Amino acid sequence: MVWKITGPLQACQLLLVVLSLPQGRTSSVLTVNGRTENYILDTQHGVQASLECAVQNHTEDEELLWYREDGIVDLKNGNKINISSVCVSPINESDNGVRFTCKLQRDQTVSVTVVLNVTFPPLLSGNGFQTVEENSDVSLVCNVKSNPQAQMMWYKNNSALVLEKGRHQIHQTRESFQLSITKVKKSDNGTYSCIASSSLKMETMDFHLLVKDKVFVMPAEPIIAACVVVVLTMAFALFSRRKRIMKLCGKKNDPNSETAL
């Protein structure tokens, strides 16, 4: 259909017609804790975090969905329409970095995501007792979790560890702090302390290293070879002796060997 506008009166009539046309749904907007954009929520270990998702500009009831990472959150029936809340309590270190997303059920492209930033003091773990033989290699692995990230260091017998070039090596990742010692000596005996220091707290974990004498183990191959040689020698000796005895017995039984009278 072609609209032909010839004057102001016709323009007003056209505007009235357009306004009287059936209107679609108003574009709904979501907010989480009053915010319309994705954001990071700073929180602490051991507290409770509440997230409230609400629909704005809706002309009819809207159903809401909550996701934790990629898994849908099971909501009660009274906690789905227009306003929906989820509660994380108590928050622990495993919740750090977790995404919570509220979505409009009829149009899941409409969403708001909240990422938890959980601060907590250093948590240390590892094998606290190790026994190794002299001249072997050993690694002391200190597992660490911390937010904010902790500053790490190694101590030996309550003093800062002096690293020996070629024997000591330190390898650090976000979740581990490893001390490797090659060709350990008796002087490496002692208590090694993994120390983690953050703005929240300083934590220490002790690793006890015992270096024992190297046990000399005779290689199995030479022993087996020696046994085989002994057995073969004995067998050959017995065989030769048996052959000689049989010859002697044969001479005794031979009539031609008797002395003539």
Curated annotation (Swiss-Prot):
Q: Which domain of life is it from?
A: Eukaryota
Tell me which InterPro entries the record gives: Ig-like_dom, Ig-like_dom_sf, Ig-like_fold, Ig_I-set, Ig_sub, Ig_sub2
> SMART domains, alphabetically?
IG, IGc2
Instruction: List locations, semicolon-separated.
Output: Cell membrane; Cytoplasm
Q: Where is the Ig-like C2-type domain?
A: 27-113, 121-206
- For the Extracellular compartment, the record's topological domain ranges are 27-215
Q: Which GO terms describe its molecular function?
A: cell adhesion mediator activity; cell-cell adhesion mediator activity; protein homodimerization activity
List of glycosylated residues: 57, 82, 92, 117, 157, 189
Q: What is its main location?
A: membrane
For this chain, the Swiss-Prot or TrEMBL PTM comment says: N-glycosylated.
Question: Could you list which ranges are Cytoplasmic topological domains?
Answer: 237-261
- Which residue ranges traverse the bilayer? 216-236
Q: Function, please?
A: May control cell-cell adhesion, cell migration and proliferation, cell morphology, and protects renal epithelial cells from oxidative cell injury to promote cell survival.
UniProt protein name: Transmembrane and immunoglobulin domain-containing protein 1
Please name the source species.
Mus musculus
What is the gene called? Tmigd1
